[in-house]
Amino acid sequence: MALSNSTTVLPFLASLWQETDEPGGNMSADLARRSQLRDDSKLEALYILMVLGFFGFFTLGIMLSYIRSKKLEHSHDPFNVYIESDAWQEKGKALFQARVLESFRACYAIENQAAVEQPATHLPELKPLS
């Protein structure tokens, strides 16, 4: 059975506290300074909690409004009804096909008549310098 060794920590902490404390310092001034620091730290903690609270409140509000705006099940808005229908997709396909056909009609090739009329003529080439 292992015995707890919690009593050995207390002398170590006491000696550590005495080393960090100023020797010959004014004890009442030191206590006043420490109490003032404790009051300030309470206000700092309150300030941090308030900032986090406001941030959380605004974040929650933005998140809920975003979620609410994405619910389209009960929306009878004409735009949402139009998006849910397939009519716009059919119109989009027809418009895409018309544009493709129009672009094919606008494309044409220009041929070099001199090259077509003389297919047996040898074209000059640059000979590599070796």
Curated annotation (Swiss-Prot):
GO molecular function, one term: potassium channel regulator activity
GO BP annotation list: membrane repolarization during action potential; negative regulation of delayed rectifier potassium channel activity; potassium ion export across plasma membrane; regulation of heart rate by cardiac conduction; regulation of ventricular cardiac muscle cell membrane repolarization; ventricular cardiac muscle cell action potential
Post-translational modification: Phosphorylation inhibits the potassium current.
Cytoplasmic compartment residues: 68-130
Location(s), subcellular: Cell membrane; Apical cell membrane; Membrane raft
Cited PANTHER family: POTASSIUM VOLTAGE-GATED CHANNEL SUBFAMILY E MEMBER 1 (PTHR15282:SF11), POTASSIUM VOLTAGE-GATED CHANNEL SUBFAMILY E MEMBER 1, 3 (PTHR15282)
Entry's family note: Belongs to the potassium channel KCNE family.
Subunit structure: Interacts with KCNB1. Interacts with KCNC2. Associates with KCNH2/HERG. Interacts with KCNQ1; targets the complex KCNQ1-KCNE1 to the membrane raft.
Protein's UniProt name: Potassium voltage-gated channel subfamily E member 1
Protein source organism: Sus scrofa
Protein's gene: KCNE1
